[in-house]
């Protein structure tokens, strides 16, 4: 709309059209570890891995107590390089900054060229943070923990990784997908806070998704971690940063969860456990590139404040978040059509909101 007015003897023309700055777009990308091994017995890769001389294993006490660390050291001892091995087995659930600092001190003393993260999300996340500060002692934790919308556009830039050591992640639960993601969640329990760190530099170099490590996981952990997988896949699928590559992975992970989680929980069937282990990794690749949503934001706050298991917190929230996102209001137009398309295959309802609520 053009408007005019007379000022003195001159005509002044004002252009009242809204001016919008051109949005700077990054090229689309899809980033995952260099190698992913994913069959029973795939831990044997460690016996063949080249260029390893000093290996530090980061785990929780249970990994040492129940012999999982022994499975790893057995393969390392078969390696032609005969690497020296250091074990740090003090990672607790929701690893604290103090634990990370303690692990970094051990790394600085031992000087590993390979770090093996063995365990659930806590061990893998702690190992990533230790790796970060081992490689970059002057890294700014406050800057790295800053909030952001797009991981590629924030002000703080993570330092380069891999100058001193490679990261190998071996998950022993089927939930976090941390073995293939660019995320690490570190707690400050003195403040009841969780800090999600996110940058593609945190992506492990190698993931070993060996289902033999999850055959005996207890039923409760199987349920909680399985629902975490489902939440990862659903949130990645309806993310505003989703794309053709992440959609394919997210949808397949959802199908695997619905088909195999009940049997994995009820009978510990080996095939079901293997499929859920794959689903966890597949969902991890999806959300590492499409990112997550309000469900995980709230779950991290709940976990930080009340120390609820992460998968359980997600399970509490997921039905409510789906219903909230399923309302076709102007601020959420990106989400509900993608929910509705597949939910309508299961429920016949007169509107997207009704089918999503069902």
Where are these regions (language model features)?
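Gly/Pro-rich interdomain helix-loop hinge
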Residues: 305-349, 353
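Single conserved hydrophobic/aromatic residue that forms the stacking wall/gate
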Residues: 1-15, 347-358
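Glycine-rich phosphate/pyrophosphate-binding beta-alpha loops
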Residues: 175, 285-294, 299-308
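Predominant activation on well-ordered alpha-helical scaffold segments within soluble catalytic domains
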Residues: 47, 73, 86, 101-104, ...
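ATP/NTP phosphate-donor binding region
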Residues: 20, 25-114
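Carboxylate- and glycine-rich phosphate/diphosphate-binding segment that chelates Mg2+/Mn2+
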Residues: 180-290
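Glycine/threonine-rich beta-strand-loop-alpha-helix active-site module
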Residues: 98-105, 109-209
């Amino acid at each position: 709309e053009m408007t005019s007015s007379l000022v003195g003897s001159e005509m002044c023309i004002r252009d009242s059209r809204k001016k919008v700055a051109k949005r700077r777009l990054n090229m689309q990308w899809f980033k995952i570890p260099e190698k992913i091994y994913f069959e029973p017995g795939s831990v044997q890769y460690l016996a063949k891995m080249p260029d390893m001389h000093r290996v530090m294993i980061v785990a929780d006490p249970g990994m040492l107590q129940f012999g999982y660390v022994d499975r790893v050291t057995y393969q390392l001892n078969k390696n032609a390089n005969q690497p020296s091995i250091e074990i740090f087995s003090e990672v607790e659930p929701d690893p604290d900054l103090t634990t990370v600092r303690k692990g970094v001190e051990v790394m600085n003393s031992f000087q590993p060229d390979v770090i093996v993260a063995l365990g659930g999300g806590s061990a893998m996340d702690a190992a990533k943070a230790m790796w970060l500060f081992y490689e970059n002692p002057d890294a700014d934790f406050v800057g790295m923990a800053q909030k952001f919308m797009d991981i590629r556009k924030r002000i703080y830039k993570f330092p380069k990784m891999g100058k001193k050591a490679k990261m190998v992640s071996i998950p022993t639960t089927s939930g976090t997908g941390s073995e293939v993601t660019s995320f690490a969640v570190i707690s400050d329990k003195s403040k009841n806070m969780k800090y999600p760190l996110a940058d593609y530099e945190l992506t492990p170099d190698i993931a070993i998704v060996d289902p033999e490590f999850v055959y005996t996981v207890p039923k409760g952990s199987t349920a909680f971690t399985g629902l975490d997988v489902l939440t990862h896949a659903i949130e990645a699928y309806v993310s505003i940063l989703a794309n053709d590559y992440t959609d394919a992975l997210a949808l397949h992970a959802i199908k695997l969860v619905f088909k195999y989680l009940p049997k994995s929980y009820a009978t510990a069937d080996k095939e079901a456990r293997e499929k859920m282990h794959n689903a966890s990794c597949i969902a991890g690749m999806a959300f590492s590139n499409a990112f997550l949503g309000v469900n995980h934001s709230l779950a991290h706050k709940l976990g930080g404040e009340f120390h609820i298991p992460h998968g359980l917190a997600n399970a509490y929230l997921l039905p409510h978040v789906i219903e909230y996102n399923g309302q076709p209001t102007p601020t959420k137009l990106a989400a509900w059509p993608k929910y509705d398309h597949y939910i309508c295959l299961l429920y016949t309802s007169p509107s997207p909101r009704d089918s999503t609520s069902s």
